[in-house]
Amino acid sequence: MSISIRPDEISSIIQQQIEQYDQEVKVANVGTVLQVGDGIARIYGLEKAMAGELLEFEDGTVGIAQNLEEDNVGAVLMGEGREIQEGSTVTATGRIAQIGVGEALIGRVVDALGRAIDGKGDIKASESRLIESPAPGIIARRSVHEPMQTGITAIDSMIPIGRGQRELIIGDRQTGKTAIAIDTIINQKGEDVVCVYVAIGQKASTVANVVQTLQEKGAMDYTVVVAAGASEPATLQFLAPYTGATIAEYFMYKGKATLVIYDDLSKQAQAYRQMSLLLRRPPGREAYPGDVFYIHSRLLERAAKLSDELGKGSMTALPIIETQAGDVSAYIPTNVISITDGQIFLSSDLFNAGIRPAVNPGISVSRVGSAAQTKAMKKVAGKIKLELAQFDDLQAFAQFASDLDKATQDQLARGQRLRELLKQSQNQPLSVAEQVAILYAGINGYLDDIPVDKVTTFTKGLRDYLKSGVNPYFQDVQSKKALGDDEEKALKAALEDYKKTFKATA
């Protein structure tokens, strides 16, 4: 029996099979490791790699494409990469570095990639944001006009900071730079400000101490800590500040006020120098690569006070720079000074002389903060910077002059008392009303007959007296942030009453 083959039936079966055939075809951009070591990998292939693209190695290590050269791609590793071997494959992910952000980050300690490192479990992020985001444009911003109170009298009176400002904290090691930053975070309690503290290249014990201080003061309730310690790869130390800015940006675009501390950018620049030299990029001044200015400018330009249309949010940046022997003319300090809106200069001489915070009012400046200063503070702080500057000049002159006239002696005496009342203990920020009261007492001669060694005791007692509610001054100034005639009258009465009590008990 012959089998009759019907071509139309066979062709319809083949067509049916073709239509049902569904094999998934994956197109991958794959390369091969040519060389690996010192946190750097050179990869052959990856023709379509983007600058800054995430690359995945066989052992699961992630890298970032940095150098796109003619015959290879230079990548920096975001991990140890001990298992990566020459000849192993690398896959381009098609993604740029991004982290998960959201309310769940508040109160947590994360690494430079937004992963929890505080042992409290994973963080459920509400959305992802690129680590490298463009800064807000000119139209998206408005001028700085709201105060960012640090709680430190010397700063709030002479070098005021506004929301959306970039104010550099600069000084030698062990002069109290981190202390000022931490005090500022503690002072934001109850102000509805989200704070981000970025620790770059620091010892794990130092970061643990900072976190403990913030927890003890109840400041972790509104703070995120981003840590890339000294033992982390240079890549993560380089990325940590951008991660901090990205977290703050999420809240800023939600209409909140944020504060970011970068502690410190000198170490970020050193990490970037290390990466660049290993990638064989040409070195420039102090062996830093030519674009080291750009790594800081693109970071600090992300700080802004947003316009009303964009929700009135703000990001205030307090970058920290460590100087060597007070040399502010070195490469990185001059770069960051030129990018920021002013600097708080901490002097090791003042610190060693027991003047803490060791703020040098002569070199320190705030270029935009005066527009944000509260009316009450503006009224009392106008004279203080000038008086202190004159005191410094007179003090230098008085060392050589044997007999001084009465006016000069009085000015020197007042200068000593002003300097004394600006001294402040660590982790004890003051409210606006307290600061205004002690400054008012200083510039209006209420301390002139108080011995210099008793000034601190007097001001502490005065603050306690005002807070006790005996006098209406404290509540009025705290709510209005202005020193009108009524408030001034109440303050004068309080000063006279307290001074009598103080003199009677002294």
Swiss-Prot record:
Can the keyword Membrane be found in this entry's annotation? yes
**Catalytic function, reaction form:** ATP + H2O + 4 H(+)(in) = ADP + phosphate + 5 H(+)(out)
Single annotated GO MF = ATP binding
PROSITE patterns, per the entry: ATPASE_ALPHA_BETA
At the top level, the lineage of the source is: Bacteria
Q: Which residues does the record give as ATP binding sites? A: G171, D172, R173, Q174, T175, G176, K177, T178
Keywords from the UniProt entry: ATP synthesis, ATP-binding, CF(1), Hydrogen ion transport, Ion transport, Membrane, Nucleotide-binding, Thylakoid, Translocase, Transport
Q: Please state what class of enzyme this protein is.
A: translocase
One GO cellular component term = plasma membrane-derived thylakoid membrane
Query: What EC number(s) are associated with this protein in UniProt?
Result: 7.1.2.2
Topology with regard to the membrane? Answer: Peripheral membrane protein
Sorted alphabetically, which Pfam families does this protein's record hold? ATP-synt_ab, ATP-synt_ab_C, ATP-synt_ab_N
List the residue(s) that the UniProt entry marks as the site Required for activity: S364
Localization, UniProt: Cellular thylakoid membrane
- Briefly state the protein's biological role: Produces ATP from ADP in the presence of a proton gradient across the membrane. The alpha chain is a regulatory subunit.
Q: Which family does it belong to?
A: Belongs to the ATPase alpha/beta chains family.
Subunit composition and interactions: F-type ATPases have 2 components, CF(1) - the catalytic core - and CF(0) - the membrane proton channel. CF(1) has five subunits: alpha(3), beta(3), gamma(1), delta(1), epsilon(1). CF(0) has four main subunits: a(1), b(1), b'(1) and c(9-12).
Protein's name according to its UniProt entry: ATP synthase subunit alpha
Q: What is the protein's species of origin?
A: Nostoc sp. (strain PCC 7120 / SAG 25.82 / UTEX 2576)
